[in-house]
């Protein structure tokens, strides 16, 4: 175990160069540097962002904390000015700030004071439909409430809350609500599908769901701009989308009620997520807390995640698109985190086609997650997952598996008859190709779980078996089932 030093955003060291330029704030190490030499793999130190000693307040740009005034322009104007000045801090003071999408730019630290609540508008027309990635595939979605692309030296820090107003976006399943909650939801508007099982915020959202059936939330067909606009409510954005950014810090803030995934760094480098809280309703569809996708060098430490789907999830793209991107998620330290409700505490996949390697997970607690440690993929993905090191994990009240490897996630992969039973389909084993996922060299030790539906479940592919899984000192008590190897 390693002791995590607290982040010293408040304990700043300033320097001044010989030309008397404005002082620069250096964010000190938030983790004992010795850990890098103690890892079971070689990993360079995660670089932290730096910011000039310059700050502005969004009030000076006309922002009003009345919960009624739309502050989109004021907040983005403040960000643009700080960026134009060479960088610094944009301060969001206490108050209720209604806004549309916020675009973070290089060298900007968006700082929220205590009791600052940033509420993203329920007017979905404020979020333009853009080309982006969702669940590992290139598609079109609405712009995220918080986004950055190709930015460097960016941060969201402080003590405030960002509320994505996700209840206005998400479909909701009847079996996840009480009878009273369901009646109230249906009475609020929207539509219910033909089976009476799922509520959607609009007819357009329902159409999007129909066109996306069996295609992982991505609509099929030749669609016009008017088609996309009609389905806008289906094109739920992630709450925070950072794409191809370098030196990123999220610290201290709370992110809640996301339209789909909450935090989604994609193809980023040098990422630190420290002392962050994610709070999504347990019924939130696709309400993952953190999806770290195709990123290199990351610290995920001292966080609390409460999610409607996966808690801490490592990804790298889906199927052929992920393999062509060829960007593994690698060199990641995950320490001292707590995951409450969620479909998995620590998860790899199922979108892992670009590969996953050099992941270190230590000192984490999972309380009531559907599954504890979850590895998932299927035929068609391809990708290599290896060199995963997990230790000192404590879990309680896990309804399903404490540890699972499931290479049949999401149904049957290519090469199988969709009309056959999954196991009967194995009479003809497909050949190993680039579409075959590989899981190997995974080391798990010192895991304690009290209460589980099943202790361990391995469900591998006959053509590419799960290899070299090392388990040491795994204690699962009060489990309904023991170990199942398939």
Identify the meaning behind each predicted range.
Residues 79-83, 98-107, 251-252, 261-267, ...:
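Short, T/G/N/S-enriched strand-turn elements that build extracellular solenoid repeat scaffolds
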Residues 1-11, 15-17:
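Single conserved hydrophobic/aromatic residue that forms the stacking wall/gate
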Residues 114-115, 152-160, 246-256, 269-281, ...:
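Right-handed parallel beta-helix
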Residues 96, 267, 277, 316-318, ...:
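Active-site-proximal loop/turn and secondary-structure-junction residues that shape catalytic pockets
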Residues 87, 101, 121-122, 142, ...:
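Short glycine/acidic-rich loop motifs that flank beta-strands on beta-rich extracellular proteins
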Residues 352, 363, 369-486:
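Extracellular beta-rich repeat passengers
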Residues 16-91, 96-252, 260, 274-276, ...:
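Extracellular "leader-to-stem" segments immediately downstream of a signal peptide or signal-anchor
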